[in-house]
Structure formats: structure tokens, C-alpha cells
Amino acid sequence: MSKIKGKIVLITGGASGIGRLMGEMAQEKGAKALVIWDINQESIDATVKELGKKGTVHGYRVDVSRHEMVAEQYDKVKKEVGDVDILINSAGIITSNKTFDQCTEDEIKRTMMVNAIAPMYVARQMLPDMVQRNEGHICTIASAGGMMSNPKMSVYAASKWAAVGWSDSVR
């Protein structure tokens, strides 16, 4: 609890699913402020309204696969909310449930961008500030898909294996 209490927590993909649950848990553990990054404005608004009843919540529409947008929105968060103490990379997508030979180039690119490369973009923005303060935590949510093969979700599995390998390597 002491690692979250009084801290600013930023969660990518924080307006739904596991990201939203992580936000609820951060609030329960005493986070000073919760920052939600998500691509779906309607979900952001609903989450800010609901979780805002329990504490300070800020919502930003961010496509984490666009590094320029990540940099711009991170600067905005620092000005409007403060230094991020805890980053939870939770944004993720599944674009198909088919064998690799049936996946389109766009499905492959989008899945890898959001699930594998975006966590790196986001962490790369925040890590220098955390290092300078000698304080901060980065948590990347993957899935069992990052630990085992799945013939009908090979691209998803590859993206999550990449996220797991990268996260383990930078800790």
C-alpha cells in the first residue's frame, strides 16, 4: 500500500477492462490522482465520471501507438496533474482470431504497435523523469498469451511475448 498511497498513477488503456480495474485498485490503495489514457473518449468520460466519485481522476484521449501524441500528452499531464509516479501499461488489442496466414498486414502492424511498441514509447517518455527523481515504477500488463503459443492468435502472442521480454529486460 505504501508504494501507491499519495502517488500519481497513469494507466494506459485505463477506461475499460484490466486497466479500469487497476485504476479502481489504485484508488483503493490511496493514489493521490489517477490519470487515464485511452483511445475511446466515451469510455474515458464514463470512467472519469464513475471513478471521480472516489477520488481525483483525469482522462486524456491518447493513441499510445503514436509516439508524438504520447510525448505531447505526457507534457500536458505533467503540467496539469504533476509527475507520474507509477505507470501501468495496460493498453492492448486483439485484432483477429485466425491463423497467421490469414492475418492482414494492417492487423499485424496494429497489434504489434499497440501491444509491443507502445509500452516502450510510453515508458521512454516517463522513465527519464523517474530516474532523475530516483523514484517511480513501471508495470506492463501482458497476458498468458505472452507465455504460451496459440495458433489462432499468433500475432497477439508475438506481441505479448515482446512486451514480456522487453519488460523483464528493462527492470
Features from the language model and the residues they span:
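Canonical Rossmann dinucleotide-binding motif of NAD(H)/NADP(H)-dependent dehydrogenases/reductases
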Residues: 2-34
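Conserved glycine-rich Rossmann-like NAD(P)H-binding loop of the short-chain dehydrogenase/reductase
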Residues: 31-46
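The beta1-alpha1 cofactor-binding region of Rossmann-like NAD(H)/NADP(H)-dependent oxidoreductases
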Residues: 41-42, 61-72, 105
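Substrate-binding pocket helix/loop in short-chain dehydrogenase/reductase
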Residues: 98-100, 104-109
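Active-site loop immediately N-terminal to the catalytic Tyr-X3-Lys motif
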Residues: 100-101, 150-154
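Active-site helix of classical SDR
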Residues: 123, 159
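Residue(s) in the substrate-gating loop at a strand-loop-helix junction
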Residues: 143
